[in-house]
Amino acid sequence: MDIDIHTTAGKVADLERRLEEAVHAGSARAVEKQHAKGKKTARERVLELLDEDSFVELDELARHRSTAFGMERNRPYGDGVVTGYGSIDGRQVCVFAQDFTVFGGSLGQVFGEKIVKVMDLAMKTGCPVIGINDSGGARIQEGVVSLGLYGEIFRRNVHASGVVPQISLIMGPCAGGAVYSPAITDFTVMVDQTSHMFITGPDVIKTVTGEDVSMEDLGGARSHNTKSGNAHYMASDESDAIDYVKALISFLPQNNLDEAPYDLDRVEDTAAELEPTDEDQALDGLVPDSPNQPYDMHSVVEAVLDDGDFLEVQAMFAPNIIVGFGRVEGRSVGVVANQPIQLAGTLDIDASEKAARFVRTCDAFNLPVLTFVDVPGFLPGTDQEWNGIIRRGAKLLFAYAEATVPLVTVITRKAYGGAYDVMGSKHLGADINLAWPTAQIAVMGAQGAVNILYRTDLAEADDPEGRRAELVQEYEDHLANPYLAAERGYVDAVIQPHETRAEVVRALRLLRSKRETLPPKKHGNIPL
């Protein structure tokens, strides 16, 4: 139908036509192909993420200005990215979603300018920004301007870091330089089988190195969740990914000047019942008699958190340490915990970096950190030493020492050597340090200590094994316990395991008014 744009009615109709074109910028065939892969369109993702009727789109009518390679003949509205703002559970967020059905989601000048604009808006208004990545990369037809806009996006990612929460959803390809934007954000969520992220693809790798690798093995969700640690959650499908992001947002504040969201009903109940529950009482028998027998630290974490509700982060990467979010009396907290059922809970390179990054995230966004300790030390081996366990393990120490949020640490069993110091010790600035009677706080474990201290004695003994057992028992009785540390104030109290939740609650109540500042400086020089 012809529209007379010289009349008011015609102008209104013309706008409606343009907006309709913008909504259906991708061809029906492109949308069909997207759905056939189990992927939603950009708009479908945004609408599922945000509260109903809350999305306000920005730059819906923006179009590229390129004339190279016949581009002037195809100028769809929106230019392949949907941007705007809306709410999640009533809280404002800014979003952008790359649209693979338009130019393969490739980034050109206008595309990049739209993302930059919404990121600037997020920083000005102090609200989280969520990016949905599904892109073929830079728009080759627009040349170096595409690279320039990638750089502009990266700079804003860096400037927003620690100011507003940034979350990346990888819901398709994300390759080349584009990967560095999600890498800088606070959390990256990928979808099994449909998300792929890499610097160089399988074909280039085959050409340069001769290696044969599939796209899924190289940069799929499982690889980045288990091997590289680039991703924080592997979703079974796109709806699962979106649900995880909504859960994440529920624990995070709007920005670095805000408190984290809280459950008002729980917060107002200041006389909350602190009598031990059945779950609390079960902790008294959790730690095995043998120090070499493992147990699941999740049991401790879930007993302390409200309703046992724990949102784990990076569960598939470095499983020897647990990190994630929960609530205590309705208020968000971050949790770091050694996991004895994985590598005996030792700290290795991956675990150190995983926990360090998480502690710094909590510190940036005013979330108290609860630390549960059962660590026999750093993982020994040439592989660890040559790959930089000294430098990379120091990141965790650095993260705890620079944190100014409330820090509460509970030692459940082993806390040996340098790993004792690193795991939120009093010496690094933790506020309240508690220990169970099963805690063994010492320079090293009994077996290693006896081998060093009594080498001659054992060599001369008529029954070396019997003598060793005696000396090990003596060492554990006198040195591998929580009481020497308690005598010196390194732990504030030795508590019964069933008292843990109540003591953590009391500590966090006290620490709500904590104020601590670090020495003035531009920034620390964390050992990267």
Q: Across the structure, where does each feature detected by a protein language model lie?
A:
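Ligand-binding clefts of soluble mixed alpha/beta catalytic domains
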Residues: 1-528
